[in-house]
């Protein structure tokens, strides 16, 4: 193992991109996509400070999808946590959940809980 190879890998910045698909709740008018975008811009911490995204993190909105792109490291768990926090704040956490929609787990989707299965069990 050479030291030169490690220095090359360290100098190269790896950008990560995550997408939150909110099409179902936005179509049903349960939530507004603009409010989630604003919430993420205010709450994402960079360097220990919330709201100071700078050039390292960008948030873009396209119809019913929000894309968060980071130049350095960015935790997918942190994005899921903030999305859940938004749902709880707007009292829709009881109906919606955040699910990783693909194998790479860079696409999150807001889906409804499957209530039809639970109704049959409660009647017993």
UniProtKB/Swiss-Prot annotation:
<dbReference type="Pfam" id="PF01776">
    <property type="entry name" value="Ribosomal_L22e"/>
</dbReference>
<keyword id="KW-0687">Ribonucleoprotein</keyword>
<keyword id="KW-0689">Ribosomal protein</keyword>
<dbReference type="GO" id="GO:0022626">
    <property type="term" value="C:cytosolic ribosome"/>
</dbReference>
<protein>
    <recommendedName>
        <fullName>Large ribosomal subunit protein eL22z</fullName>
    </recommendedName>
</protein>
<dbReference type="InterPro" id="IPR002671">
    <property type="entry name" value="Ribosomal_eL22"/>
</dbReference>
<dbReference type="GO" id="GO:0003735">
    <property type="term" value="F:structural constituent of ribosome"/>
</dbReference>
<comment type="similarity">
    <text>Belongs to the eukaryotic ribosomal protein eL22 family.</text>
</comment>
<dbReference type="GO" id="GO:0006412">
    <property type="term" value="P:translation"/>
</dbReference>
<dbReference type="GO" id="GO:0005730">
    <property type="term" value="C:nucleolus"/>
</dbReference>
<dbReference type="GO" id="GO:0009506">
    <property type="term" value="C:plasmodesma"/>
</dbReference>
<dbReference type="GO" id="GO:0005829">
    <property type="term" value="C:cytosol"/>
</dbReference>
<dbReference type="InterPro" id="IPR038526">
    <property type="entry name" value="Ribosomal_eL22_sf"/>
</dbReference>
<dbReference type="GO" id="GO:0022625">
    <property type="term" value="C:cytosolic large ribosomal subunit"/>
</dbReference>
<dbReference type="GO" id="GO:0003729">
    <property type="term" value="F:mRNA binding"/>
</dbReference>
